[in-house]
Amino acid sequence: GWLYGNGGAGGQGATAGAGGAGANGVSSTNGGGTGGNGGIGGTGGAGGAGGNAGLLGVGGAGGHGASGGAGDRGGAGGTGFISSDGGAGGDGGDGGNGGAGGTGGLLFGAGGNGGPGGSGGAADIGGNGGAGNGGGTDGNGGNGGSGGGAGSGGDGGGAGGNGAWLFGNGGAGGGGGKGGNGAGGGLGGGSFGLPGLNGSGGDGGDGGNGAPGGVLYGNGGAGGQGSSGGIGGPGATGGAGGKGGDGGDAQLIGDGGNGGNGGAGGTGGTPGPGGPGGSGGLGGLLFGQTGTAGVSP
């Protein structure tokens, strides 16, 4: 409806087809419609974009990407209007990236969180998470989505969204998938791309944990590197560095994986703390050494 009704949801995609976009909200408290989910197929369909909000409505969530041979990305969240938040990004299908979070409204809207990446297949790596940016003067950036896990090591998490130009805090980086690296936190709000006076930096993403070794033979995977914290403003704190991922355990014969190093703290009026290192994986029950623990910067 033109005054209060929410936008309609997008339709479900046909086999291997993309989901439809959610309808836009028009006025008052209208929220945007949710994007349709992608159809299941050999390369799963993309999720539809969430509808944009009306006057006070929240942006619609992006549709989820379908699971398929390669997967597809989740739809982007819709944009908030005046003081409303952006919609969340859709989940990635297997092997697909998460959708980006929608941008916050013009005055105070927070950015939507990025959707998580889908799990990787036997050979695929997981997708990256998306990120949303804060709108207006003090909208906070959305958090980056987590990276998907995978047999060959997960991909990194999404970067945190940037805070709005005056007071917004940066969003936190998403955690890495198994064996992957987390992405860095977003910048605190700043005018023309510079850190604002009161915007804190987003925390860095944690590194993903290493996968265990094979049942009989095989070394554990190494933990992912934690990412650096985002930059804070002169009157604010830099983001904390992400934790290093733990090394994977060997099972019977093999060495444990090394732990990932922690990320550096972000700069700012007060620097953020560095992230702790991950623990080393255990060696095999019959033969094998314990992995080396990661260090904090």
Predicted segments, located by residue:
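Long, compositionally biased tandem-repeat segments
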Residues: G1-P297
